[in-house]
């Protein structure tokens, strides 16, 4: 059996819809992949990729510190039991508490920042709390992946991470076998369709 990789995430879609190809490649390369996330009716789709899935409750929107402490404890127990060679985390709470748990046990850790969240853009006390937690969770990260340079610069300028920790990716990628390439239409007028939330942090101001 190859090296054990633990992936922690907060939702089925985070892994299956956006990271399915990565997971399949890791399994193909011989990694023993374990995925920790909240169970959903579609969880068998992830298991079919050849990985083991562990049900871990993650309340994405809760501000209850008791729930967050429970999540930290769940990650500590999971890492202690599974003894992974590397932990890869996605999304804010998983990055923070997964990183903290890895620090306690000296397990190599990498984080993927899929977005900074509204707290960073709104500022105030909540932003300061999230920033402080991120500094603790990401302190020993071997690498922190970003999908755009703007998010990376925010955490670097806030001294949440060091320059050498930041790794900017060219997007999450598109499976061209599932979504085939099409030629541009011959129309001279180019029309854009924006599908997303009407929020500044989602790029509305750049349209």
Segments (PLM) and residue ranges:
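Active-site proximal beta-strand in glycosyltransferases
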Residues: 4-6, 102-119, 134, 145, ...
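Short hydrophobic "strand-cap" motifs at the C-terminus of beta-strands
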Residues: 8, 147, 192-196
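N-terminal strand-loop element at the rim of the active site
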Residues: 8-66, 166-168
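A conserved mid-protein helix/loop that constitutes part of the nucleotide-sugar donor-binding site
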Residues: 16-21, 190, 194-207
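Donor nucleotide-sugar binding/catalytic pocket of nucleotide-sugar-dependent glycosyltransferases
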Residues: 54, 135-181, 191
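Short His-centered aromatic/hydrophobic patch
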Residues: 89-95, 113
């Amino acid at each position: 059996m190859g090296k054990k990789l633990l992936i922690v995430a907060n939702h089925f879609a985070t892994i299956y819809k956006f990271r399915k190809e990565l997971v399949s490649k890791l399994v193909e390369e011989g990694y023993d992949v374990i995925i920790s996330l909240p169970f959903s009716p579609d969880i068998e789709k992830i298991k079919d990729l050849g990985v083991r899935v562990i049900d871990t409750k993650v309340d994405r929107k809760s501000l209850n510190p008791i729930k967050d402490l429970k999540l930290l404890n769940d990650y500590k127990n999971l890492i202690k039991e599974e003894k992974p060679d590397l932990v890869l985390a996605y999304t804010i709470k998983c990055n923070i508490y997964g990183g903290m748990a890895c620090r306690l046990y000296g397990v190599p850790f990498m984080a993927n920042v899929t977005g900074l969240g509204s707290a960073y853009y709104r500022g105030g006390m909540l932003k300061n709390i999230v920033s402080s937690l991120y500094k603790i969770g990401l302190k020993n990260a071997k690498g922190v992946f970003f999908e755009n340079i703007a998010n990376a610069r925010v955490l670097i300028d806030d001294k949440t991470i060091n320059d050498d920790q930041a790794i900017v990716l060219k997007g999450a990628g598109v499976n061209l076998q599932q979504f085939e390439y099409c030629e541009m239409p011959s129309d001279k007028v180019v029309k854009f369709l924006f599908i997303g939330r009407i929020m500044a942090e989602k790029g509305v101001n750049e349209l």
